[in-house]
Amino acid sequence: MRSAEWGRVLSLRTPHSELRTQTLSGDYSSLFSGAYEHSVDDKGRTVIPARFRQKLGEKFVMTRGLHGCLWVFPERTWSGVQQKLMPKSLLDDRGIKLERYFLGAASECAPDRQGRVAIPPMLMAHAGIKSGESVWVVGLTDKVEIWSRARWDEFNESLTDEIIAGLGREAEMPQYG
């Protein structure tokens, strides 16, 4: 897809579009896509695909994601995510809960020479990831997700063509063809 088309797609109004457009740099070659299956070793490490490591940089931030997965952000975009999650005031209970959920669980990570990254125990528990099992490492535009195989399969099995079409209409996705 050409950059102009990505710009059109990224300017859509979705529940998370404000956060996303603030964290993307405008260089669409840095966007993530694709899914890779890897195993988790007995030390809680998994491989981040080379293609993703290149875009994530030397250091990145891993935190809780929605739907029982983990989110991994490039360090260069993490400050934008943090700013968007800041509560409006010290008394903003909802904002504080969001901040606590995502920022409180955040962990700075760096891959080793084999491209493996250690998943902190708290994040493994959140995502249902266990040593010796498979995970899916999924590129999702401005971030990478890490899913336990069981949750990834369950999530995908729950989606039908009708659900996807409905979500596309709600997000006002442009028609291509």
Task: Specify the residue positions occupied by each region the protein language model found.
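Flexible "stalk/tail and boundary" regions
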Residues: 1-38, 42, 52-114, 121-177
